């Protein structure tokens, strides 16, 4: 076989053996405070084409709250989805400093083990200062599963790594570049955690 063709085939096979992630900042006006509190709004369930994935909104909110809880003093989640104005009222009533608004942009759960089509997920995260109602940051994270799998993968498994890196970065000093998650066979990348920044 042609050596070049062999290399191309091997590279394409290796690419299918890893999850891939991205984290993107759209806007950021300052550093979030670690001694603050936050309310995470429950987003609407994700969908792909005409398929709605029940419970995906709650899974997203829990993943976002878990990541913010590593940095903030207190984090809670709203009991149901609703309008931004409604969630701001709840945040004010609960004396929260920040309202975190995740939105499920894309949620695609595939039987990858036999279809070869990967799971995909994209979440937008907005951080709002409750007293001023000003948006402090807006960004998104995304993940695509490996296609070489024996099954059991679900889209929410792709959230922890890029979410953690993006949310940790919101507490980093101004000028700190947003790190990009590397493609990993499994979600084993370690990253700095804790509230000492």
Regions found by a protein language model. Name each.
Residues 1-17:
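Sec-dependent bacterial lipoprotein signal peptides
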Residues 56, 60, 64, 87, ...:
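Stable alpha-helical elements in mature extracytoplasmic
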Residues 65-89:
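Short beta-strand->alpha-helix linker/helix-N-cap micro-motif
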Residues 16-72, 171-197:
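A structural "domain/chain start" motif
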Residues 46-55, 113, 148-153:
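Second-shell loop/turn segments in exported
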Residues 18-19, 82-136:
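Surface-exposed short loop/turn segments
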Residues 43-45, 103-108, 142:
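Generic short beta-strand segments
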Residues 122, 128-182, 186:
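Short secondary-structure boundary motifs at beta->alpha junctions and helix caps
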């Amino acid at each position: 076989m042609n050596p070049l063709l062999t290399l191309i085939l091997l590279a394409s096979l290796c690419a299918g053996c890893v999850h891939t992630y991205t984290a993107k900042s759209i806007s950021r006006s300052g550093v979030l405070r670690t001694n603050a509190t936050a309310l995470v709004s429950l987003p609407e369930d994700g969908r792909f084409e005409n398929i709605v994935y029940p419970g995906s909104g709650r899974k997203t909110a829990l993943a976002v709250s878990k990541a913010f809880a590593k940095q903030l003093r207190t984090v809670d989640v709203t009991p149901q989805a609703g309008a931004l104005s409604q969630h701001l009222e709840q945040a004010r009533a609960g004396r929260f400093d920040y309202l975190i608004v995740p939105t499920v942009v894309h949620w695609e759960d595939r039987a990858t083990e036999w279809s070869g089509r990967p799971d995909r997920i994209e979440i937008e995260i907005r951080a709002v200062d409750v007293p001023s109602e000003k948006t402090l940051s807006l960004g998104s994270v995304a993940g695509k599963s490996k296609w070489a799998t024996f099954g059991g993968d679900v889209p929410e498994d792709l959230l922890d790594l890029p979410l953690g890196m993006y949310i940790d970065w919101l507490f980093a000093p101004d000028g700190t570049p947003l790190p990009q998650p590397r493609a990993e066979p499994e979600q084993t990348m370690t990253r700095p955690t804790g509230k000492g920044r």
